[in-house]
């Protein structure tokens, strides 16, 4: 790709406001995204710990954390879109070029994210009554956490 082509990819209207506004909003929304990811990972780890415990207290915590983890994944996905859009506004031609060069990773992370989310729901469906019966299918929760961590590694590396 030549420099002339990169300049041609630039938006002719330019950035809609001062770039600092978009950089600050990008950092703010990324911080919110990371907070949701931390809630998701922490709730997932507590779910794994509590679901297979003999203690009723841990199982009750696991039931609550499973619901929290499920919701936190959705919140993390929604909050993860905004920083990407702010990056796209500020670094438009470079964003396009990097996505073309790493297209398989960009497309692959969406598929891995979907499979990780499905694995979380499979664990949820198998464990409607964790408190009484204990956890079942822990491999699904482990797979979900591993796949969601892989998504984070792909996107943020």
Model-assigned labels for residue ranges:
Residues 29-37, 66-70, 106-109:
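Alpha-helical transmembrane segments of integral membrane proteins
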Residues 72-141, 155-156:
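Membrane-interface helix-loop-helix modules in multi-pass inner-membrane proteins
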Residues 41-62:
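Membrane-interface helix-loop junction between the first two transmembrane segments
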Residues 37, 44, 70-73, 77:
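Residues within membrane-spanning alpha-helices of integral membrane proteins
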Residues 1-30, 57-61, 85-104, 157:
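Membrane-interface interhelical loops and short amphipathic "cap" helices
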Residues 26-27, 59-73, 128-148:
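Alpha-helical transmembrane segments and their helix-start/interface "positive-inside/aromatic belt" motifs
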């Amino acid at each position: 790709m030549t420099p002339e082509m990169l300049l041609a990819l630039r938006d002719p209207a330019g950035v809609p406001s001062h770039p600092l506004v978009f950089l600050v909003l990008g950092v703010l929304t990324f911080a919110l995204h990371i907070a949701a990811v931390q809630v998701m990972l922490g709730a997932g780890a507590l779910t794994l710990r509590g679901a297979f415990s003999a203690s009723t207290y841990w199982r009750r915590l696991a039931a609550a954390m499973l619901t929290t983890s499920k919701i936190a994944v959705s919140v993390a996905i929604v909050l993860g879109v905004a920083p990407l859009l702010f990056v796209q506004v500020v670094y438009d031609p470079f964003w396009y070029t990097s996505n073309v060069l790493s297209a398989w990773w960009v497309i692959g992370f969406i598929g891995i994210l979907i499979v990780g989310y499905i694995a979380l729901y499979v664990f949820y469906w198998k464990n409607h009554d964790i408190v009484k019966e204990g956890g079942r299918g822990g491999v699904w929760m482990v797979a979900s956490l591993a796949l969601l961590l892989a998504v984070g590694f792909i996107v943020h590396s």
